[in-house]
Amino acid sequence: MSVELWQQCVELLRDELPAQQFNTWIRPLQVEAEGDELRVYAPNRFVLDWVNEKYLGRLLELLGENGSGIAPALSLLIGSRRSSAPRAAPNAPVSAAVAASLAQTQAHKTAPAAAVEPVAVAAAEPVLVETSSRDSFDAMAEPAAAPPSGGGRAEQRTVQVEGALKHTSYLNRTFTFDTFVEGKSNQLARAAAWQVADNPKHGYNPLFLYGGVGLGKTHLMHAVGNHLLKKNPNAKVVYLHSERFVADMVKALQLNAINEFKRFYRSVDALLIDDIQFFARKERSQEEFFHTFNALLEGGQQVILTSDRYPKEIEGLEERLKSRFGWGLTVAVEPPELETRVAILMKKADQAKVELPHDAAFFIAQRIRSNVRELEGALKRVIAHSHFMGRDITIELIRESLKDLLALQDKLVSVDNIQRTVAEYYKIKISDLLSKRRSRSVARPRQVAMALSKELTNHSLPEIGDMFGGRDHTTVLHACRKINELKESDADIREDYKNLLRTLTT
């Protein structure tokens, strides 16, 4: 089987998948032909497992359809093709359970120099891979200090390092996997975080979560830390903001205690650093973190990082750091879709022991779209207003409680703004959107703009039609239905719509 056939099928799969999914899971794969067998290499176990579960079946179908008509023999492996410089796989025992009709792979512990872990895949169906569990981290830290007497939400952990360097880090005990609301927008990030929490040191190192503010990155990071401590209360799990790392380093330099600083940060079992983008243009901090990062990975200790953008897009960050951040798994956290926003509101109301009617939650979720933090803030205002006024939560009460916020949202997301944003995105004129032109290059953006207007504003279909050159409301309805269909079948439209939605609501 030729590598060219594989590339052809990958391009076909690209058309079927959202760009984020393709770039995260399919693009990193490498391939080489070995006789009649095709060998596909994944950079780590997590990518291998996910590709095997989610995409392998479709890839085999495409290979069969575009080749000889027979599904080919194919092997999934961890590592790099032999024509590339291999990178050593982490020390991790891996076991595979394969159905009787499939080739068996013995559980084994990867030697430090090994670059490949093969998992045989038969032509008939995808192989089922199960990752074995490992013991939790070794105890390397002082036991966690008792929580504040008032039952505070943050767990204080204070460690005194000989040489006068004292570090205190916090894990919010309410940020757990149980309190995290999962949806399409954060499914991949949640799955990756759980794998790290349940099986640390298994190759997803570092785990890099990126996305806008208030989307749940910090929640997931705390959830991992809390789970690790639940498994081993004596584990040294250090969570901190990147600015805290810088401050500790400066203090260590002032106290002439840099060696103690290094010893402390390089002795942790798991280092969780939030907002890594704040290292940008801090050369001394980047230098120290570079060596700390290397020491932790060489020692098999877990590193989890978050940022507001993709690592390679962080300006002022050294290329060697960007490269190392890509050694593990990088996952985006997207703004929550409507259903997830409703679920978040219902869960928060339940935690607060407040009755929130579903239509009220839907009303808030429709209008607060940017991030979870703003969503929770809006709910708190509504609950407070309900308590002070002695009234049940209704849509009328929500309008009163969020009067200024809703007015601001309506002002920010207007049909005029949508038309301008869509025209700029597709590089056409606003007048084209309002014209009678029916060429695809104009008609499709017009339909997208109409669908966005229906979703993001409170205008009726006839009102939207009037603002698009005096069109009938049935034209707007057809446009909305067409775009909803295309979002399911056309990856480009789906990506365009998501990008425009993000631009208009953040």
Swiss-Prot record:
Assigned protein family: Belongs to the DnaA family.
Domain of life per record: Bacteria
Keyword DNA-binding: yes
Function text: Plays an essential role in the initiation and regulation of chromosomal replication. ATP-DnaA binds to the origin of replication (oriC) to initiate formation of the DNA replication initiation complex once per cell cycle. Binds the DnaA box (a 9 base pair repeat at the origin) and separates the double-stranded (ds)DNA. Forms a right-handed helical filament on oriC DNA; dsDNA binds to the exterior of the filament while single-stranded (ss)DNA is stabiized in the filament's interior.
Domain comment, as recorded: Domain I is involved in oligomerization and binding regulators, domain II is flexibile and of varying length in different bacteria, domain III forms the AAA+ region, while domain IV binds dsDNA.
Subcellular location: Cytoplasm
Gene3D superfamilies: 1.10.1750.10, 1.10.8.60, 3.30.300.180, P-loop containing nucleotide triphosphate hydrolases (3.40.50.300)
SMART domains reported for this sequence: AAA, Bac_DnaA_C
Protein name: Chromosomal replication initiator protein DnaA
Gene Ontology CC terms, in alphabetical order: cytoplasm; plasma membrane
Region (Domain II): 87-169
GO molecular function, one term: ATP binding
Chief location of this protein within or outside the cell: cytoplasm
Annotated positions binding ATP: 214, 216-218
Source species of the chain: Pseudomonas putida (strain ATCC 47054 / DSM 6125 / CFBP 8728 / NCIMB 11950 / KT2440)
Keyword flag ATP-binding: yes
Chain segments carrying region Domain III, AAA+ region: 170-386
Keywords, comma-separated and alphabetical: ATP-binding, Cytoplasm, DNA replication, DNA-binding, Lipid-binding, Nucleotide-binding
Subunit structure: Oligomerizes as a right-handed, spiral filament on DNA at oriC.
NCBIfam families: DnaA
Region (Domain IV, binds dsDNA): 387-506
A single BP term in Gene Ontology: regulation of DNA replication
Biased composition (Low complexity): 139-148
Residue ranges, annotated region (Disordered): 135-154
Region of interest: Domain I, interacts with DnaA modulators: 1-87
